[in-house]
């Protein structure tokens, strides 16, 4: 290997380490690592977003705690079952070989029992403290992640995250059903937004890890089609995400105007990063920037939904309407 190739390899490795810092900078206890706790906050954020889209927001504290607690337990169970299924795969990848299960820090039996316990606890919490629909949707999300995505789609098709993304899109439905006992059109809007956002978000990471996936035969889009093709696909899904996000103006029971205004910089930055990656698809630093911003983007959307349901938003809309009517009156005279 010549010096230029070695430098390029080291550069790629350093970028990957920066994007997935947990492997280098933060060591979790084995029992916590298998639960994949870094994925849980965003799932809970979109659950809150689903709640905020209903007339019943805000929920009572007991129902809110039961919904989020049940969701966190189910997500932990899904993460553990995913680790169990992919244990042999993780052993073959340098990046994942030191994880708790492939490294022998935990036994398969222990992890399986923990996953079952978390699933049962989540079900009991949601059934007793929320409702059957929220419990059923939560279990559907768990099943979708473990069976549909991990077992069926991930090892077989480059469209794995397109269809497998349904697992990550279910929490908004859980939130809406927890609040009202049914999903409603607004809940389905946020479900659709997460579905469109997921491929662009995940493929940005997959560009950085395409060599890792290729080494074990996982057909992630960048590994099979290359970075140029993937960047174009990211652009399509990114634009679809932006257009869908604007529909939140109409999905909100109130506060849509403030949401729409605050949304502009989020969408602008997302499109900017997507365009930069499209210009230089093999630039790992650009893929890293897009991946990181896409996480902040979805957190931001959920935060905007919550802000839009506050008294501040109501007052803003009232004042805006008064200003608008005053302008119309002046123009008509």
Swiss-Prot record:
> Misc remark for this entry?
Carbon 2 of the heme B porphyrin ring is defined according to the Fischer nomenclature.
Q: Where are the transmembrane segments?
A: 64-84, 110-130, 133-153, 161-181, 189-209, 246-266, 287-307
Annotated NCBIfam families: cyoE_ctaB (TIGR01473), PRK04375.1-2 (NF003349)
This protein's species is Prochlorococcus marinus (strain MIT 9301)
Catalytic reaction(s) noted: heme b + (2E,6E)-farnesyl diphosphate + H2O = Fe(II)-heme o + diphosphate
Member of which family? Answer: Belongs to the UbiA prenyltransferase family. Protoheme IX farnesyltransferase subfamily.
Q: In which pathway does it act?
A: Porphyrin-containing compound metabolism; heme O biosynthesis; heme O from protoheme: step 1/1
Places the protein is found:
Cell inner membrane
State a single Pfam family of this protein.
UbiA
**CDD domains given for it?**
PT_UbiA_Cox10
Q: Tell me the membrane topology, using the record's own terms.
A: Multi-pass membrane protein
Keyword Transmembrane helix: yes or no?
Answer: yes
Sorted alphabetically, which PANTHER family does this protein's record hold? 4-HYDROXYBENZOATE SOLANESYLTRANSFERASE, PROTOHEME IX FARNESYLTRANSFERASE, MITOCHONDRIAL
User: Can you list the disulfide-bonded cysteine pairs?
Assistant: none
UniProt cross-references to PROSITE patterns, sorted A to Z: UBIA
Write out the GO cellular component annotations: plasma membrane
What domain of life does the UniProt record list for this protein's source? Bacteria
Please indicate if the UniProt record lists Cell inner membrane as a keyword.
yes
**Protein name (record):** Protoheme IX farnesyltransferase
Keyword annotations for this protein, in alphabetical order, are:
Cell inner membrane, Cell membrane, Heme biosynthesis, Membrane, Transferase, Transmembrane, Transmembrane helix
Output the InterPro entries linked to this UniProt entry: Protohaem_IX_farnesylTrfase (IPR006369), UbiA_prenyltransferase (IPR000537), UbiA_prenylTrfase_CS (IPR030470), UbiA_sf (IPR044878)
Q: Name one GO molecular function term.
A: protoheme IX farnesyltransferase activity
| A biological process term (GO) from this entry | heme O biosynthetic process
| Role description | Converts heme B (protoheme IX) to heme O by substitution of the vinyl group on carbon 2 of heme B porphyrin ring with a hydroxyethyl farnesyl side group.
Q: What is its EC number?
A: 2.5.1.141
